[in-house]
Regions:
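Surface-exposed, polar helix/loop patches in the mature regions of secreted/periplasmic/lumenal proteins
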Residues: 74-119
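Sec/Tat signal peptide C-region and signal peptidase I cleavage site
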Residues: 13-18
Length: 119
């Protein structure tokens, strides 16, 4: 079921039309992500949650790696402070307010509010 969902999501978003900074549902405009969730209901919300989790984990890992290698002073954050469901609801709420922004912009703003991790 998860593999099918992955391929379904991948085919939903055009990837050859332009260069992308981030890929998948978190790389889309908020309006597209909201339409996707509305169209596919709980499966759409699960896909959005998975994209959010992947984005935050990947971004945080890059921040941590750059910090540990001395390339940046920015430190990683505690990304599981709230439940994934709460984060998804936050992103959905912010996307409703500003449907023209990209989901990753909402996520980067959210990320900056998180406490620093200790490592």
């Amino acid at each position: 079921k998860i593999i099918f969902l992955f391929f379904f999501i991948a085919s939903f978003f055009k990837v050859s039309a332009k260069d992308l900074a981030t890929w998948g549902i978190t790389g889309s405009k908020c309006s597209q992500a909201l339409a996707f969730v509305q169209r596919f209901g709980s499966n759409g919300k699960m896909a959005l949650s998975s994209g959010i989790q992947g984005f935050l984990t990947g971004y945080n890992s890059a921040v941590m790696l750059n910090n540990l290698q001395g390339k940046s002073r920015e430190k990683a954050r505690v990304i599981n402070r709230s439940s994934l469901d709460s984060i998804t609801n936050y992103v959905t709420s912010q996307c409703r307010r500003t449907p023209s922004v990209s989901v990753y912009v909402v996520l980067l703003k959210y990320y900056k509010t998180l406490p620093y991790a200790k490592y």
